[in-house]
A protein has these predicted regions:
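Active-site or metal-binding loop neighborhoods of secreted/extracellular toxin and effector enzymes
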Residues: 139
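Conserved short loop/helix modules at catalytic or binding sites
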Residues: 74-120
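Generic structural signal for short, flexible, solvent-exposed coil/loop and linker residues
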Residues: 42-44, 70, 96, 101, ...
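GIY-YIG nuclease catalytic motif and its immediate N-terminal context
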Residues: 1-75, 79, 115-120
């Protein structure tokens, strides 16, 4: 019976996956609304080629919690995540513990000036850490 349920769930997911927006995280994280609120406090006026991105980090083996990596790149968040996972200029925390890109909170922080992105990356990491999250990156 459990095999039938698993197959039904696989079919359901295959149909539903097409309509799930890429910015929606694939798991529930209780602190994610806090991340959205904090990220919305940051703005950039000038357009450019840099993107701010967040990566969900898995610390389940340590204390059962999740963390977040804050980064900046000229590549799209998805491309940069793939580079991290492939070991290309990879942050160790993302290479080892990165699960997925949390695109939603930083959608408004895409294509901004490099100088602004650098400042926002650092300040966003500090703000998230001040809110009690485990934060890596942000430098």
């Amino acid at each position: 019976m459990s095999i039938n349920i698993e197959r039904a769930l696989e079919r359901l997911w295959a149909r539903a996956a097409v309509s799930v927006p890429e910015w929606l995280p694939m798991r529930y994280i209780e602190w994610l609304p806090i991340v959205y609120d904090i990220a919305l406090e940051f703005r950039s006026i000038d357009k450019g080629r840099s993107n701010i991105y967040l990566v969900l980090l898995d610390y389940q083996d340590r204390d059962g919690a999740y963390g977040v990596y804050v980064g900046m790149s000229k590549y799209s968040p998805a491309q940069r995540f793939d580079q991290h996972k492939a070991g290309i200029r990879a942050a160790g925390s993302v290479l080892k513990r990165g699960i997925e890109v949390l695109t939603g909170p930083t959608l408004h922080l895409q294509y901004i000036k490099r100088s602004e992105a650098s400042r926002i990356e650092e300040e966003l990491a500090l703000a998230l850490a001040s809110a009690g999250l485990r934060v890596m990156g942000g430098h």
